[in-house]
Structure formats: structure tokens, C-alpha cells
A protein has these predicted regions:
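Aromatic-lined carbohydrate-binding/catalytic grooves of carbohydrate-active enzymes
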Residues: 331-468, 481
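Short Pro-Gly-centered flexible turn/kink motifs
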Residues: 95-96, 102-109, 289-308, 791-799
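Glycan-recognition surfaces
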Residues: 425-464, 508-616
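Conserved, mostly hydrophobic/aromatic
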Residues: 15, 170, 294, 340, ...
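Extended acidic/polar, glycine-enriched regions
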Residues: 171, 177-180, 260, 265, ...
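C-terminal beta-sandwich/jelly-roll accessory domains of carbohydrate-active enzymes
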Residues: 688-803
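Carbohydrate-binding surface patches
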Residues: 238-239, 248, 656-705
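Polysaccharide-binding surfaces and accessory modules of carbohydrate-active proteins
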Residues: 7-14, 18, 28-269, 285, ...
């Protein structure tokens, strides 16, 4: 709901309120953002009096905005947006260079308008944005005018009441006769009157994405930013501001994200008066946009959520928003198939015979979608050639894509492929024909990544080529799934079609070109399931999710690492968009050995697939995989569409307000609850065994406290060899470890795992927790003992009882 009167603006969602007003000077003063509050009627200055700072004199050596209002200095105000040069020395919202070389801009209130629904976004160069299927979202547009020019600045607010989310964007319009340079135009600015916050960002690198870092803010500036040309595994655009005492389930928590896939910038700054400013938007470093007369520039949409129920509460807001108002198309509500990907089974060494053998094994195990990864086109036997040449290698696939696809379909599975459309190898027909299409600087050495260069997607003819090539490819066979990869960061930003003064536009124009390609292809092929990827999570953001309903979270498939990575993503993204695979051991990225069951359980809480050679699995492991897939299919609707909650996790802080580092905790807890709260799946994982600590508990979240649930675990059988020569404590004769006798016993004798099976009310499960059966402690074992070695995990199931 939006209340407006007397130049005061109050925006309400179901549980939050956001308020600002026009100052006597014309600037917009930010009044409040947080827990929902009542505002008196009529809406006037008296109604919001408790929220207004009372300024009667100029503080210290600060500068007054103008002599007529000498009590107002912009340096010490909470503002809705800030420009450069009029006394506010904090992070600006907008920064411009005028024709005369000056920097000072002076945006003041001109008008406002309210609308129902969202405007259509059909332009080819339009940025992606949130949407509402019922088109009932409320929209506020506030227009500011620049006292120094004929520029207008539109601030847009969209209210998603059901999600407790407000989105924001900005549009700069040049109604004058002279061009202006945009050095920065942020998407979001929120000023807080205090500085008692913790700033949380998610950092990492290839194969170790989304490591959570908490920094208590004090005087100064804290920046989370990407410089890679993508939203980046180094610094995801999702960030949080929370109270010093906030936990997973209690306390104030603000979440911020950006619907953008390029270089981004989030900054928290505390000024000398103890006020905190947050800004987010396109990274201003090396950004400079020439805005001619009569044109406009739009900033990406920013997403804001607040909850008084801690990190989990805020996450629920973000999860609902992404599921309902970002992800779209045919796959928005569809259950996703269980896939088998060929990459870690064969890498580049693929051929039709090998792929069909793998597919047949997959079909027997219950796989629904077979994906042929890299290596099928050109003369692509390694990563040094053929990107850009999307022609089938008929030596590897003599019957072409259509022939292989038909054989996969005849087995009863769908067929998918891997592509990397944005890239080109120097060793390719495309590069030889169009070297000018590659993004590099003429006459200067180019810094390559993974032996490849980027195509200049700021050029329309390059976009047309990609759209045409991919359209031909996707039409050539019954392709049901496409993995769209991007395996390097951007270097040497340069477009050969832009003049020198416009090279600061290249990074953003690249992203706009990418969006055009994705928009065209997803509209032409609406039934294809597209999965985004960028060397794992190097482009995991709301911009990509506006076109592709899921993203490969990380190239690291190690279960321990993935548990932390997926936990990191869960703060801002629902698990229904996180692609996760079960791989072989030793793991190909870490060489770590983890139990097959743990690998499955971690992957099951995302969009579950497999990435290992089923043909090489021992019968025992193959049978286990078959059982895993059957179980996942039974529960995947809950796992893919349910509400996800975190409990204890590997990144738990040692003390409140400390810097959160990687893997400091020992237990990971997750719960996923169906929308009707009738079913739930729990997960408990241990990093390392600690001796003589046999007792553990599991505490679910999100259940109906008044309902009675049947609680039980996934009970397993264990190979006797996991106990080593402890077998001699029960064997009538001595058995040498790994001997023929030991192996023979292991073939026929399995150790029963513990069973948890009882009924309890939801409140008892959530508030008291479940005290689990005793773990093995070195003094004996029976079917009531929990076998819980290093990296072990358990799945728990909760089903509401109707009697």
C-alpha cells in the first residue's frame, strides 16, 4: 500500500514500512525503513513528526544548502538520494560531468505519480526486471529536476506486499540541448540514522563461492564490488545489513540485491555523525556513459527486504520474491528433472558410443535427462580451440546431434547440451573470419582466460550471430536442456565500433547485449530448460534468473564445500534455482573422500543431478544411487518448491560481531518445508568427528506448531569395512584388514544403521529439538548406535498426521 499526501510518501508491505518526504529545500529526506508502523491520518508533517530530524542550526564547518534554509546541511541528513557537489560528502547516488566540465548537480523534487501494475518492457535493450503475474503491484514514481540543467531523474518504487519486498530503480532523462556524462547512477540508496549494524557480504573465487563475511560497521566505508565484467564469484551482489545481536531467527535484518549481471557496487559508509548510508548499483569504476540530448539512461532494479525475524526471516522474503517475481516462463512452477552430466565422467574425451553407454546406465538408475557437456563441436579436444564454431564433430558423433538425441529419447530420457556462446578461440573459423568481433585492444597484447576471448556483445551483429547460431543449433534436434556457460572474466574492455570517449560504456553494453540474446532465445524456445553457468557461480544473480530458472552454483562438487556454498546462496536465493550434482570420489576439485550418501543429501537440497561415470560404479554404489534417485523423486516437490531454513552452519561465528570466516562451525542444519507445512525434509551434516561427543540434536524450522508429525530418518546399512579391524571385536576368529576374508564378509554382511521413528507436535520438534540416538564412541556398535564419521550426514522426514 502507498500513502501519499503533502509531499510525504509512506510505502507499506505486509510487515514493513518505508517512508520519506520532501524537505523545504526540495531534497527528499529518508524517514524510516523497518518493521511496519502505523502512520496517523491525515498524512501531514504532524503525522510523521516522530520520524523527522529537527534541524535548527548549521553544525560546525559544514556547508548549508542555501541561505534561505540555513539549518539544512546535506552532510548530516538522511537522504533518499544524494548528488555530488552540494555539501553531502558521502557516497553519492548520482555523479555527472556537464558540458562545461563541472560536477555539481542539484536534484530537487518536481512531481510524483502512483500507478497500478508494471509497465511493459519490450524494448530490445531493456534491462530485466521483476514482474507480477496478476499485474497488481503498486508503483510510485517520483520525478526530480536538476536546478543546474534540464535533466530529470525518476525514482521508481514497486511494492511487492506479499513478499515484504520493495524494488527500486532510477532513470536519468536528458531534456536539455547538451550531452552529459554519467559517471555513476546508483539503483538504491538507504540512509540509516544510526551505525549499530553488521555488514554481511559473500565472497569467494572459482570453486569456493559464497563465503559469508560479517563486518561490524564503524566510521569509514565498506565496499562489496565486482570488477570481473560479471556479477562475480568474488563478490556476489546480494548483501545484508543486520543488528549486532541478530541471529538466524531473531533480530533486524535487511537484505539487498540487484537485478544485474555485470560489474556492481555495494557500499556502506558511516559518517562523522554516526549515520549509515547504503548504496548499490552499477560499479562506477571505469564506467562513463555519454547521454546525448533527448535520450535517457536506466539503472538496474534493486531489491530490498526487511524482517524482524533474523536472517531466516529475511531469506524467506527474498526466496518468495525470486520464485514469484523473478523466475518466469514454462519452468517457473515445473518440477525439474534429475539429470546426468557427462563432464566429470569423460571431460573432452566423448563419442557417441561412450555417451550412449553412460546414458543407458543413467536410464537404469532412474535418470530423466542426459546432458552432453563440452567437447562435441569443431575439433574441440581441449580448451584451446573451436569456441564459436557450433558445428557437430562428426568423428565423435557420426549421426550428428539429431541422431544422438533420438537414441537418448528412445531410451526414455530427454537430451541436453552444453554451449558457451559468448566466447571464441583464436583457433576457430569464427575468429579467422571475424577477428574484429573479439573484445581486445588493437595493437596491445590481450590477457586471455582459459585460452579464449570474449565476443564483443556490445555489437548488434555479434548478438545477431549468437542468436542465429544458437537458434539453428537448438532447432537441429529435440533439445530439452541447455547449459549456457561463460568460463572467464573480462579483461581489456574495448569495443572497436565505439569512439574513444565512449569506451566507458563497453562493460554495460556487453551486459545489455547478453540480455538481448537471452531474451530472444528463451522466447523462441520457451520449453527448453536453460541453466546458467559461469565457471560455476561467477554470474549467479537475479539478472540471469530473469531468463534462466536455475544456475550451476559452483564447479566444486565436494560435499563439504558444497554444503557451505549452498548455505551461502540460501541467504538471498531459493534452493529452487541452485543446481547441484553428486560426483565421484576422490572429488575432482579437492581429492577429498566423502560418503556417497552425504554427496546425495547435499545435492538433494538443490536441483539435484549426477556428474560421475555410472558405468564405473560398483554394484553396491550403483544400487545406492538408484535408491537415492527414487527417494529424491518422491520428495523433490518439497525440496524444490518448499521453504528453506538454516539452523547451525559451518560458518557460525565464534562470538557476536566477529569476522565470520570459512568453515568455523562443525554442524550444518537445513530444513525444507512444503508450502502447506504438511511435509518437511531435514538435513544434519558433521564436518569432523570429535571423540567422546556422542550426543547430537536436530532442530527443524518452519513447521506448524499445532500439527502432529511423524518424524523418521533415512535409515541405512553400512559396509563392515568402514569399521576397519574393529571387526575382530565381534569375529570368532582373527580377520586381517582388507584380506580376502574381510572383503568376503563385507560383500554379504551389512551393518544396520540407527532408526529414528516417533510422532511429535511441531512446536516440540522446533522449540525443544530432537535428541538423536547416541553416536559411535569407540566402545561398541549395534543397530541403535548412530554411525556418524567425518563428513557424515542424515536426512530426516516429517509428515503431518491427520488422525
Amino acid at each position: 500500500m502507498i500513502q501519499t499526501a503533502n509531499d510525504i510518501f509512506v510505502l507499506h508491505t505486509a510487515h514493513t514500512t518505508y517512508a520519506f518526504r520532501k524537505l523545504p529545500t526540495g531534497q527528499l529526506e529518508h524517514l524510516y525503513y523497518g518493521r511496519k508502523i502505523h502512520v496517523c491520518e491525515p498524512l501531514d508533517e504532524n503525522a510523521v513528526a516522530p520520524l523527522i530530524e529537527k534541524h535548527t542550526f548549521q553544525p560546525g564547518n559544514s556547508c548549508v544548502y542555501d541561505r534561505e534554509h540555513d539549518a539544512y546541511t546535506l552532510e548530516d541528513l538522511c537522504l533518499e538520494m544524494s548528488s555530488y557537489g552540494k555539501g553531502d560528502i558521502r557516497e553519492p547516488f548520482v555523479e555527472l560531468i556537464y558540458e562545461d566540465g563541472s560536477f555539481s548537480s542539484d536534484f530537487v523534487y518536481e512531481s510524483s505519480a502512483r500507478f497500478e501494475g508494471r509497465e511493459a518492457r519490450d524494448a530490445e535493450d531493456a534491462l530485466p526486471a521483476s514482474y507480477d503475474e496478476k499485474n497488481q503491484v503498486e508503483h510510485l514514481c517520483v520525478t526530480l529536476k536538476d536546478n543546474n540543467s534540464a535533466l530529470k531523474l525518476e525514482l521508481h518504487y514497486y511494492i511487492y506486499e506479499d513478499c515484504d519486498v520493495i524494488t527500486r530503480s532510477a532513470k536519468l532523462i536528458n531534456d536539455g540541448e547538451n550531452a552529459v556524462q554519467i559517471r555513476r547512477l546508483m539503483s538504491c540508496q538507504v540512509d540509516f540514522p544510526t551505525s549499530d549494524h553488521v555488514f554481511t557480504s559473500f565472497h569467494g573465487a572459482w570453486a569456493r563461492e559464497m563465503r559469508r563475511w560479517d563486518v561490524p560497521v564503524a566510521a569509514g566505508k565498506y565496499v562489496n564490488a565486482s570488477y570481473t565484467g560479471t556479477s562475480s564469484s568474488r563478490a556476489n551482489p546480494f548483501v545484508m545489513l543486520s543488528g549486532r545481536e541478530t541471529t538466524e531467527d531473531t533480530g533486524d535484518c535487511y537484505g539487498f540485491n540487484l537485478v544485474y549481471s555485470g560489474n556492481h557496487y555495494e557500499a556502506v559508509e558511516v559518517n562523522s555523525y554516526g549515520k549509515t548510508r547504503f548504496v548499490s548499483g552499477i560499479n562506477p569504476q571505469n564506467f562513463c556513459w555519454q547521454l546525448p540530448a533527448g535520450e535517457s539512461f536506466e539503472a538496474p532494479e534493486a531489491v530490498m527486504a526487511y524482517s524482524k525475524a533474523g536472517y531466516n526471516g529475511m531469506s524467506q522474503c527474498m526466496h518468495r520474491f525470486v520464485r514469484e517475481h523473478i523466475v518466469r516462463g514454462a519452468w517457473k512452477k515445473k518440477v525439474r528433472p534429475v539429470l546426468l552430466n557427462s563432464w566429470e565422467a569423460a571431460y573432452f574425451d566423448i563419442n557417441e558410443k561412450k555417451l550412449l553407454q553412460l546414458a543407458k546406465a543413467g536410464k537404469e538408475a532412474g535418470i530423466e535427462l542426459f546432458v552432453m557437456d563440452d567437447g562435441w563441436f569443431g575439433h574441440r579436444d581441449n580448451d584451446r580451440s573451436s569456441l564459436g564454431d557450433w558445428k557437430v564433430n562428426t568423428k565423435k558423433l557420426p549421426n550428428g546431434l539429431a541422431g544422438l538425441c533420438k537414441k537418448i529419447n528412445d531410451l526414455g530420457m530427454d537430451f541436453g547440451i552444453w554451449v558457451e556462446p559468448e566466447m571464441v578461440n583464436v583457433d576457430s573459423e569464427l575468429y579467422q573470419a571475424h577477428p574484429d568481433w573479439a573484445m581486445d585492444i588493437p595493437g596491445k597484447n590481450h590477457s586471455e582466460g582459459r585460452n579464449q576471448r570474449l565476443l564483443d556483445l556490445s555489437r548488434a551483429e555479434v548478438q545477431d550471430y549468437i542468436i542465429g547460431q544458437m537458434s539453428d543449433l537448438f532447432s537441429s534436434a529435440n533439445i530439452a536442456y541447455v547449459k549456457w556457460d561463460m568460463n572467464r572474466i573480462v579483461t581489456d574492455y574495448y569495443s572497436k565500433i565505439l569512439p574513444p570517449e565512449r569506451q566507458g560504456e563497453v562493460a554495460h553494453r556487453y551486459v545489455l547485449g547478453l540480455y538481448r540474446c537471452m531474451k530472444e532465445l528463451t522466447e523462441r524456445f520457451p520449453e527448453i530448460l536453460f541453466e546458467g553457468c559461469a565457471a560455476g557461480g561467477n554470474r549467479f544473480d537475479l539478472g540471469i534468473l530473469s531468463y534462466f530458472p536455475q544456475i550451476w552454483a559452483s564447479d566444486d562438487t565436494d560435499a563439504l564445500c558444497r554444503a557451505e556454498i549452498q548455505t551461502g546462496y540460501s541467504y538471498g536465493y531459493p534452493m529452487s534455482v541452485v543446481s547441484a550434482h553428486v560426483s565421484s570420489c576422490p572429488n575432482h576439485q579437492t581429492l577429498r573422500m566423502t560418503p556417497l550418501e552425504t554427496r546425495f543429501q547435499v545435492a538433494a537440497f538443490g536441483i539435484c543431478g549426477y556428474e560421475c561415470n555410472f558405468c564405473d560404479l560398483k554394484k553396491e554404489d550403483f544400487d545406492a544411487v538408484k535408491a537415492q534417485i527414487a527417494l529424491y523423486k518422491e520428495w523433490r516437490k518439497v525440496l524444490q518448491t518448499g521453504s528453506f531454513y538454516r539452523g547451525r552452519n559451518f560458518s557460525d561465528q565464534g562470538s557476536t560481531g566477529s569476522l565470520s570466516g570459512p568453515l568455523t562451525g562443525n554442524i550444518q542444519e537445513w530444513t525444507c518445508v512444503s508450502e502447506d507445512r504438511e511435509k518437511a525434509v531435514g538435513f544434519l551434516m558433521q564436518k569432523l568427528v570429535s571423540p567422546n561427543t556422542q550426543f547430537e540434536y536436530y532442530r527443524p524450522n518452519g513447521l506448524n506448531p499445532e500439527a502432529r508429525y511423524h518424524f523418521y530418518n533415512r535409515s541405512l546399512k553400512y559396509n563392515v569395512k568402514e569399521f576397519g579391524d574393529l571387526v575382530n571385536t565381534v569375529a570368532p576368529v582373527h580377520i586381517r584388514q582388507d584380506s580376502v576374508a574381510h572383503n568376503l564378509i563385507a560383500k554379504f554382511v551389512k551393518m544396520d544403521g540407527e532408526a529414528e521413528d516417533f510422532c511429535a507436535y511441531g512446536d516440540a520438534l522446533m522449540y525443544a529439538g530432537v535428541k538423536l540416538k547416541q553416536a559411535f564412541g569407540g566402545t561398541g556398535y549395534n543397530e541403535q548406535i548412530r554411525h556418524f564419521p567425518d563428513f557424515a550426514s542424515r536426512m530426516y522426514f516429517m509428515e503431518q498426521m491427520n488422525d
